[in-house]
């Protein structure tokens, strides 16, 4: 299975933001318990450390500046897409049950809140990683 969003040209921010969004919520995207939704900063650090060890050589200072913002934006954007689809009768995203897209939206909104609560730490993390030399320079 290939997600065609990953093979077309686009902003690197969307790719890393979506990667972190999908990986750093231990409860997963389909959880029914919103209280279980969280943002795993340690996993985020591991992902960004690995990513920047390679990509740090071609990302600009502005690219790095906006990484935390995209990590916060992508779950909000996806939540809005799920909510819109729910309101339009579930015509875009495949659903297993009534209210499925609404639940997905709520999970993404809760994840956005969790990222927001740790946003200063996320900015500090990116700033710290930015100072580390990239082995690929």
Task: Label the predicted regions.
Residues 1-14:
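Active-site acidic catalytic loop and adjacent metal/ATP-binding pocket
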Residues 8, 70-74:
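Transmembrane helix-bundle signature of multi-pass membrane transporters/permeases
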Residues 13-57, 73-92:
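Active-site activation/catalytic loop segments of kinase-like enzymes and analogous catalytic loops
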Residues 40, 60-61, 119:
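General structural signal for secondary-structure boundaries
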Residues 55-62, 134-137:
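Intrinsically disordered, low-complexity coil segments
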Residues 59-71:
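All-alpha amphipathic helical-bundle segments outside canonical DNA-binding/catalytic cores
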Residues 77-137:
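ATP/Mg2+ or Mg2+-diphosphate-binding catalytic cores
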């Amino acid at each position: 299975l290939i997600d065609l969003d990953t093979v077309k040209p686009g902003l690197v921010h969307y790719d890393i933001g979506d990667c972190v969004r999908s990986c750093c919520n231990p409860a997963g995207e389909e959880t029914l318990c919103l209280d279980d939704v969280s943002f795993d900063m340690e996993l985020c650090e591991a992902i960004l450390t690995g990513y920047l060890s390679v990509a740090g050589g071609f990302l600009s200072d502005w690219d790095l500046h906006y990484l935390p913002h995209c990590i916060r934006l992508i779950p909000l954007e996806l939540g809005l897409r799920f909510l819109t689809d729910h309101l339009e009768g579930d015509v875009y995203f495949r659903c297993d049950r009534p209210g499925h897209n609404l639940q997905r939206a709520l999970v993404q909104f809760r994840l956005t809140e969790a990222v927001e609560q740790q946003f200063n730490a996320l900015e500090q993390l990116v700033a710290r990683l930015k100072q580390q030399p990239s082995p690929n320079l």
